[in-house]
């Protein structure tokens, strides 16, 4: 089993400029690859004797719009009490039309949608995460890896359905989770949490019909990024290291 630090250096040395970034965080190695280099790099990672990533565990879409922005102010939070200000509820998301929502989305270029691939080497017992950003935010397109790992078929369909990422070369790219005739991609940050339409059963027509949404938009769990004193690593008391319990 290769240590993550060793795997990181091997990847940097072998692939060089084909990796736009490669780093180690929390014991896991992640590599960023351009769409033009994705298939060649992935094929090498699967077939290369030093890599042998035979298994693709997962493919997931990500929408990085408003990434790193929260809805509750936590910079001045302490262990007791609250000092957080929020904007008025918007379209199912706090501040959707402000800095956390559509404005931020429209200002971003080329770094909104990505596919993240989780690879496992059964031969060498190591793992790797590969990320690839689509170059066009309006129509995100990435190469399909189904020709390398056929198991990517349904995972890519899911990313297409939920995020609208188009995988070129996919043998059957159609929706997999949403209903027939569904409009939009529900995991995108600018998709309203209450949805666009509301299904109900019409007893007169004997089928499900769609109508306007009647529920009120509200946020039950705000997006919060906590980096205050409550989440600092606990410090050991002096003189306790090495002592037996009791």
Curated annotation (Swiss-Prot):
- The lineage's top-level taxon is Bacteria
Question: Which molecular function GO terms apply here?
Answer: NADH dehydrogenase (ubiquinone) activity; NADH:ubiquinone reductase (non-electrogenic) activity; quinone binding
List the membrane topology term(s). Peripheral membrane protein
Q: Which UniProt keywords apply?
A: Cell inner membrane, Cell membrane, Membrane, NAD, Quinone, Translocase, Transport, Ubiquinone
Which cellular components does GO assign to this protein? Answer: plasma membrane
Top EC group: translocase
Q: Does the keyword Ion transport apply?
A: no
Mind telling me which InterPro entries this protein's record contains? NADH_DH_suC, NADH_quin_OxRdtase_su_C/D-like, NADH_UbQ_OxRdtase_30kDa_su, NADH_UbQ_OxRdtase_CS
According to its UniProt record, the EC number is 7.1.1.-
Which locations, inside or outside the cell, does it occupy? Cell inner membrane
Q: Name which cysteines form disulfide bonds.
A: none
Catalysed transformations (reactions): a quinone + NADH + 5 H(+)(in) = a quinol + NAD(+) + 4 H(+)(out)
Query: Quaternary form?
Result: NDH-1 is composed of 14 different subunits. Subunits NuoB, C, D, E, F, and G constitute the peripheral sector of the complex.
Q: Which HAMAP family match?
A: NDH1_NuoC (MF_01357)
Function description: NDH-1 shuttles electrons from NADH, via FMN and iron-sulfur (Fe-S) centers, to quinones in the respiratory chain. The immediate electron acceptor for the enzyme in this species is believed to be ubiquinone. Couples the redox reaction to proton translocation (for every two electrons transferred, four hydrogen ions are translocated across the cytoplasmic membrane), and thus conserves the redox energy in a proton gradient.
As for family, the record states:
Belongs to the complex I 30 kDa subunit family.
Protein's recorded name? NADH-quinone oxidoreductase subunit C
In its UniProt entry, the species of origin is given as Halorhodospira halophila (strain DSM 244 / SL1)
Q: Which gene encodes it?
A: nuoC
